C-alpha cells in the first residue's frame, strides 16, 4: 500500500513508522473539545447577565410606588390625619384639611380596606393603603406610643406597657452581653492565631463569660498552652487575712503609782510568744488579755470588768487561747523549796512547831532562810505566796502588798482575783511563788525576825483576806495583807468599804499561850489542780469547826468601826490603849479562821484546855490571841448537825450574859450591865460568855432565832433571861458577843429580822483564849450563816 493512499485518508490508522503524527492528532482533538466547552460556558454566563438586567428593568410598578410613598412620609401622615378627622365626625375640619393639604375630598368616601391607586390631575399623588380602624389608626397608634413613652421615661404607664418594656430591656441586655463576649472571644482567637497556637477551636462566648466570672466550670476550650486558658483564682476572703492585733487593756491610774511597762513584743492575739519574754518581777502591762467577763456565773453582781494588767484571774477573765502551760514558764526560783506530800495534812500546834524548830537545827535555819526569800516581797521574782486551805493539798496564791504585785484601785476589780485565790482557782497571771513551810519556824517568829516593807502604793482591800508576813531588805513594819473572796454562792455587797486588820509583829506572847492551830501548809506547783469544792446548799458557807474540806471563813466584811481605828492619828484605839501605829493608807482585812485539828500526834502535843472550848485559828503571821468582830445583826441557834444532845453545866457555869454599849456610840462605857430580871434584853449591846459553855450543843451565828434540842425558843431562860455582871479584858479567856437588839428579842420563830433592823447598830463580838481539850473531838461549830457584808463592820485581831 502506497503512502499517498494512507495520506489521503487521514482518519485511518497511521503506520507504525510514524508515531509522532498519531500523538499530535490526539492533542488536537482534546484542544477542540476544550474550546467547545468554554464557548458553551461563556454563552450561559451571558444569558444569565441578560436575564438579571431584564429583571431589574421589568420590576413591577407597585414596588416603585411603595418606595415613593416611603419617601413622601408627609403625604402618608396627611392621609391618616384626614382619616382620623373623618372617623371622629369632624367633616368640616376634614374638608378644610383636605383642601389645604391638596388631598382628594372624595378620599374619605372611598374604601380604605385595600390599596387603590388613583392618579389625580396636577400635583395629586398616589395614595397608599390606609389601615382601617374604628377610631382611626392614628389615634390607636398614638395611645400605644404615649403609654410606652411614659413607661420608658419612668412616668408611669399601664401594667402591660411596663411588662413589655421590661421584656424589651432584658432582651437588649442579653444581646449586648453576648455581643461583647463574642467580640472578646474573637480577640482571643485572633491573639492565638498570631502566636501560632490556634488549631481551629471554636470558643463559646457564653462559656467564656462563665469562665471569666470565676465560676467553677470546665474550660471552654482545652488549649495546649496554660496561659491561653488560665483557671480563674477566687477572691481572697478578708475575714481570714484581717487578723488585727488586740491591744492590751491598760487602765493605769497615775494616782496609784503603777508604772506602765512597755511590752517587749507588739501585742497580738497569740499568747504563747508573749508570756515567756516578759519579766515576771515587773508590772506586766503588755500581755494581751481580755477584759471581758467570760463566765457570768462568777460572783460579780456589779458586772464591771476588772483590770487585768496585774490582777487577772481564771475565774472571771479567761482568754480563749490562753492556756496555763503556754502562758508562763517556770523559773528556777519558782520551784517550791519544801513541798511535803499529801499525807502531811494534819495540823500542828504552836508548841510542836517550837519543838520542831529546836530539833531541826541548821536545816530549819536554811529552810527558814529559803522560805523567807520566797515570801519576800522585795525579791526579784517574789509574787503572791501560796496559802493552803485546811485539809487541802493545793495552795492558793495570796495577794502580797508589795510593789511587785499592784492591785487595781477598784474593789470590784479586786474581787475577781480574790475569788480564785481563796477557793482553789489558780491565778495564772499572778507572779506567784511557793509559800513558806511552817515546819521549821512559827509565823510569829518569822514576823518578829524579818521586818516588813512599807508599801508605797497603797490600795483599798474590799473583802477579808489571809494576811501574810512580807519581808524585805528595808526596815519598818507595815500591814501586809492578802485578799480572798467569797464563794460563788455568797451574797456580795456592793459597798466599797475597807475593813482593817491589825497585824502585830511583836512576838511578845508566849507560843504556848497562842492557842492556835496551823494546818500543815503545803505549797505545790502553781499549775497544780485546784482543790475540789464541796457543794453547799446554804446561802453563806460559814466557819465550821473541825471542817478541813472548806475554808474557815467566807464572809465579806464592811467598814471599820470608829472605836477601833483612828484615821487622824493612824493608830488603833483599843481598851488597853493605843496599839502600834499602822499605815492609815493601807487597808487590810482578815478572815475569822477557826478550825479544829484532828486527833493525832499533833493533838497530843498540845497543852490541855478547858473542856468545851474551841480553838480559834488566827490568820497566818498573827501573834495575837484575841479577836474583835463587829456584828450588825446576828442570832444564836444550835448546830443542825449535832447528833448528841448535851446539857448545859450547872451552878456557876451557866451561860452568863454580859452587856456592853456600842463601841461607836459610847467608847468609854463598854460594860454597862442589864438587870437580871429582864426577860428580853432591852439594850442594843449584849454579849454571851462562851467560856462557860462546857459540853453544850454547837453554836451558830446566823440571822435566825435561838433554838435548842432541849428547849423551845420561848423557854430559853439560860441564854437571855439570866444575866450577870462580867468584865472583859483584851487578853482574858472570856468571849464577849455583842449582837444587835434583836438577838434576844427575836427568840420566837414568828419574829423574823428584816433588813431595816439589821443595820441599826453595830455591835462587838470578841473571842478570848479559847482552846480545846486533848483527845476529844470538836464540841462546837461556829458558823456565820445567812449573812452578808452589811452584817459585819470590823474584824480586829488584838495582841
From Swiss-Prot:
Residues 73-105 form the LisH domain. The gene is FLO8. Its main location: nucleus. PROSITE patterns: LISH (PS50896). Keywords: Activator, Nucleus, Transcription, Transcription regulation. It is found in: Nucleus. Residues 354-370, 482-497 have a biased composition (Basic residues). Belongs to the FLO8 family. The keyword Transport does not apply. It comes from the Eukaryota. One of its GO terms (biological process) is regulation of biosynthetic process. This is Transcriptional activator FLO8. It comes from Saccharomyces cerevisiae (strain RM11-1a). GO terms for cellular component: nucleus. InterPro entries: LisH. Required for diploid filamentous growth, haploid invasive growth and flocculation. Putative transcriptional activator of FLO1. Residues 41-55, 307-317, 341-353 have a biased composition (Low complexity). Residues 1-10, 270-285, 318-340, 371-396, 460-480, 584-593, 660-675 have a biased composition (Polar residues).
Amino acid at each position: 500500500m502506497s503512502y499517498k493512499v494512507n495520506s489521503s485518508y487521514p482518519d485511518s490508522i497511521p503506520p507504525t513508522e510514524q508515531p509522532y503524527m498519531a500523538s499530535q492528532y490526539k492533542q488536537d482533538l482534546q484542544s477542540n473539545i476544550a474550546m467547545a466547552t468554554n464557548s458553551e460556558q461563556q454563552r450561559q454566563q451571558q444569558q444569565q447577565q441578560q436575564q438579571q438586567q431584564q429583571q431589574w428593568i421589568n420590576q413591577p410598578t407597585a414596588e416603585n410606588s411603595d418606595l415613593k410613598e416611603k419617601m413622601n412620609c408627609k403625604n402618608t401622615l396627611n392621609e391618616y390625619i384626614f382619616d382620623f378627622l373623618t372617623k371622629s365626625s369632624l367633616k368640616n375640619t376634614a374638608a378644610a384639611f383636605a383642601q389645604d393639604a391638596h388631598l382628594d375630598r372624595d378620599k374619605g368616601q372611598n374604601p380604605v380596606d385595600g390599596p387603590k391607586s388613583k392618579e389625580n390631575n396636577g400635583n395629586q399623588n398616589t395614595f397608599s393603603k390606609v389601615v382601617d380602624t374604628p377610631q382611626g389608626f392614628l389615634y390607636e397608634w398614638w395611645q400605644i406610643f404615649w403609654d410606652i413613652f411614659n413607661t420608658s421615661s419612668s412616668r408611669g404607664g399601664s401594667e402591660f406597657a411596663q411588662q413589655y418594656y421590661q421584656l424589651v430591656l432584658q432582651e437588649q441586655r442579653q444581646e449586648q452581653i453576648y455581643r461583647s463576649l463574642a467580640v472578646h472571644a474573637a480577640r482571643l482567637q485572633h491573639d492565638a492565631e498570631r502566636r501560632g497556637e490556634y488549631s481551629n477551636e471554636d470558643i463559646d462566648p457564653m462559656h467564656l463569660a462563665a469562665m471569666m466570672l470565676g465560676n467553677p466550670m470546665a474550660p471552654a476550650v482545652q488549649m495546649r498552652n496554660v496561659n491561653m486558658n488560665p483557671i480563674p483564682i477566687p477572691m481572697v476572703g478578708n475575714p481570714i487575712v484581717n487578723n488585727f492585733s488586740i491591744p492590751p487593756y491598760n487602765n493605769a491610774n497615775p494616782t496609784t503609782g503603777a508604772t506602765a511597762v512597755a511590752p517587749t513584743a507588739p501585742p497580738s492575739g497569740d499568747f504563747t510568744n508573749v508570756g515567756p519574754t516578759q519579766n515576771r518581777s515587773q508590772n506586766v502591762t503588755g500581755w494581751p488579755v481580755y477584759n471581758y467577763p467570760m463566765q457570768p456565773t462568777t460572783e460579780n453582781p456589779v458586772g464591771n470588768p476588772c483590770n487585768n494588767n496585774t490582777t487577772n484571774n481564771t475565774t472571771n477573765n479567761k482568754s480563749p487561747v490562753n492556756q496555763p502551760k503556754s502562758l508562763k514558764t517556770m523559773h528556777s526560783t519558782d520551784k517550791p523549796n519544801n513541798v511535803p506530800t499529801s499525807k502531811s495534812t494534819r495540823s500542828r500546834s504552836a508548841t510542836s512547831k517550837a519543838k520542831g524548830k529546836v530539833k531541826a537545827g541548821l536545816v530549819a535555819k536554811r529552810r527558814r532562810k529559803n522560805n523567807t526569800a520566797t515570801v519576800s516581797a522585795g525579791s526579784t521574782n517574789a509574787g503572791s505566796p501560796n496559802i493552803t486551805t485546811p485539809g487541802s493539798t493545793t495552795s492558793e496564791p495570796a495577794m502580797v502588798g508589795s510593789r511587785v504585785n499592784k492591785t487595781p484601785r477598784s474593789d470590784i476589780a479586786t474581787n475577781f482575783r480574790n475569788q480564785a485565790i481563796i477557793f482553789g482557782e489558780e491565778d495564772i497571771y499572778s507572779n506567784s511563788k511557793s509559800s513558806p513551810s511552817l515546819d521549821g519556824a512559827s509565823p510569829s517568829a518569822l514576823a518578829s525576825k524579818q521586818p516588813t516593807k512599807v508599801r508605797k502604793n497603797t490600795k483599798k482591800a474590799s473583802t477579808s483576806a489571809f494576811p501574810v508576813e512580807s519581808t524585805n531588805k528595808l526596815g519598818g513594819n507595815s500591814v501586809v495583807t492578802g485578799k480572798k473572796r467569797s464563794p460563788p454562792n455568797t451574797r456580795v455587797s456592793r459597798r466599797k468599804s475597807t475593813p482593817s486588820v491589825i497585824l502585830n509583829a511583836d512576838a511578845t506572847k508566849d507560843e504556848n499561850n497562842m492557842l492556835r492551830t496551823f494546818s500543815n501548809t503545803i505549797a505545790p506547783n502553781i499549775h497544780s489542780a485546784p482543790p475540789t469544792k464541796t457543794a453547799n446548799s446554804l446561802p453563806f458557807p460559814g466557819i465550821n469547826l473541825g471542817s478541813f474540806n472548806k475554808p474557815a471563813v467566807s464572809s465579806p466584811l464592811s467598814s471599820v468601826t470608829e472605836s477601833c481605828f483612828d484615821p487622824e492619828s493612824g493608830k488603833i484605839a483599843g481598851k488597853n490603849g493605843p496599839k502600834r501605829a499602822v499605815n492609815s493608807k493601807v487597808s487590810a482585812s482578815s478572815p475569822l479562821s477557826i478550825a479544829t485539828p484532828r486527833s493525832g500526834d499533833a493533838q497530843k502535843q498540845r497543852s490541855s484546855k478547858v473542856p468545851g472550848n474551841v480553838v480559834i485559828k488566827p490568820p497566818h503571821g498573827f501573834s495575837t490571841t484575841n479577836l474583835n468582830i463587829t456584828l450588825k445583826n446576828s442570832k444564836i441557834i444550835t448546830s443542825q448537825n449535832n447528833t448528841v444532845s448535851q446539857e448545859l453545866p450547872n451552878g456557876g457555869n451557866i451561860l452568863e450574859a454580859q452587856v456592853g454599849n456600842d463601841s461607836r456610840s459610847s467608847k468609854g462605857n463598854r460594860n454597862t450591865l442589864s438587870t437580871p430580871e429582864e426577860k428580853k434584853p432591852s439594850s442594843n449591846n449584849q454579849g454571851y460568855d462562851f467560856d462557860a459553855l462546857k459540853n453544850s450543843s454547837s453554836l451558830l451565828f446566823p440571822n435566825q432565832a435561838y433554838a435548842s434540842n432541849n428547849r423551845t425558843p420561848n423557854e430559853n431562860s439560860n441564854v437571855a433571861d439570866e444575866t450577870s455582871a462580867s468584865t472583859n479584858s483584851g487578853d482574858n479567856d472570856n468571849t464577849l458577843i455583842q449582837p444587835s437588839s434583836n438577838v434576844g428579842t427575836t427568840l420566837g420563830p414568828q419574829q423574823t429580822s428584816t433588813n431595816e433592823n439589821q443595820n441599826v447598830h453595830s455591835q462587838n463580838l470578841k473571842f478570848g483564849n479559847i482552846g480545846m481539850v486533848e483527845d476529844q473531838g470538836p464540841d462546837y461549830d461556829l458558823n456565820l450563816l445567812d449573812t452578808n457584808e452589811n452584817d459585819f463592820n470590823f474584824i480586829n485581831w488584838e495582841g
